[in-house]
């Protein structure tokens, strides 16, 4: 299987706390840098100017980037925020960002909820959110990817209104919206433990031809049967095993490490990135870059 992807290799999510340490790493020999692309949440960087804005520009001139949105609220009841999308579209163009992705969730209901809330697994919700995804793709004039989110309510319970399983819901949205998938391996693990399904089966049932890239991250063990997606710790062995399974199923695909806090030193962080690369080398690449990356034009 071959998949047209916007980037290739190993990725790292850029956080402000990483800018200093990674700026030092820019002086390393290129072959010692264990990542090939980076990801940012546009809401955190669009308004940035001054010194930090220049530092950010230095990163986008050096590496291919993708953008992962936080606040579009694709499943929310309020109209889509086209002012935000206008800013996102300009941001993508300014920094030659290769793909925009968002969460299959909602985060606003007459005000921002400051969390990513899951969408009910119903046919009505499939049609509703798919229509909004198509509107976003039309406005941005490019495909977008959606990420299946971690959730903690029993949304798959028919007694609570569920009409389908999580995997059937995700696949129905992908087909109806004709969009791409951001496969989050840690979310599959967390949801599998919390809701009693096999994450191996979940990943195997996804349409590999729609995957634009993957996320991998750490989580918090609240209890044996309750895991919380935090991006604040090292990736554990069962999640690495799921990544290996994804590569066995689909072939090696671009994969990005998310680390939001408790950020370790470069040596420790780079070791996890190299581990991703090690798994990728075990399998034939399934990725075909959609176009060659070029340095962003100067403003």
UniProtKB/Swiss-Prot annotation:
<dbReference type="Pfam" id="PF05114">
    <property type="entry name" value="MbnB_TglH_ChrH"/>
</dbReference>
<dbReference type="InterPro" id="IPR007801">
    <property type="entry name" value="MbnB/TglH/ChrH"/>
</dbReference>
<comment type="similarity">
    <text>Belongs to the UPF0276 family.</text>
</comment>
<protein>
    <recommendedName>
        <fullName>UPF0276 protein ABO_1518</fullName>
    </recommendedName>
</protein>
<dbReference type="InterPro" id="IPR036237">
    <property type="entry name" value="Xyl_isomerase-like_sf"/>
</dbReference>
